[in-house]
């Protein structure tokens, strides 16, 4: 396996510091949060992008993905959405990152309408992304939290420049088992975001292995050589433990899981309070 972590866990941290932490703790990659609060985002000047790329290369760390906030299934005109997608693609290309994360964001819309928006926009933007050596990844999130929902869109898009990002928290919260998520996402998958929490009611981030998410079952499905990216949501939970002190423990936990490639026999969904159990599927 290859391991990365998201800079969402290091709000506002300079690129050099994030790269040094990754190298020090054995992570090959970083997922960069592309927001104006952070050092790198779509409005960052070209010279700063070049400097960041050189800093990362000197540390031996690659940019796995650029985590953007474009909502491809949301209502509204296509023009601003497509322009924002192109800006993220250019940022990723400048940083030599293979992926750009996008959100669905279709909450409040009928499912068919949200799907249609996402399909139309991803179809339009995917060739541009592919031409820059980048792939747009629709995250399992908000209006499309399951592998089934993301795949429903991506099956219709049908282009190499669009794929999926499996956020294991949201598929679990939606009641989807890891095997079900993998079945639907595997043909489209870019990489997997892992994390851990205490329960479905308490989403404060924990170090990997300290919570209830079925990370053993998730990693059992990911093929050798795939990327696992730890998204520790410190930005949204400022009272959570600082990430740097957890990086070694988190990576060691993923390494242990990756060495055991078989899922536990007889594992089934339990209550949200049970280790590894998923919340009951909504009616």
Where in the sequence are the language-model features?
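Histidine-acidic metal/acid-base catalytic patches
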Residues: 1-4, 11-26, 53, 57-60, ...
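Surface-exposed loop and edge beta-strand positions of immunoglobulin-like domains
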Residues: 6-8, 139
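Conserved phosphate-coordination/catalytic loops
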Residues: 9, 43-47, 79-83, 116, ...
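Active-site acidic/histidine proton-transfer and metal-coordination neighborhood
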Residues: 16-17, 58-59, 74-164, 173, ...
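Structural motif corresponding to the early beta-alpha repeats
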Residues: 28, 32-120, 170, 224-229, ...
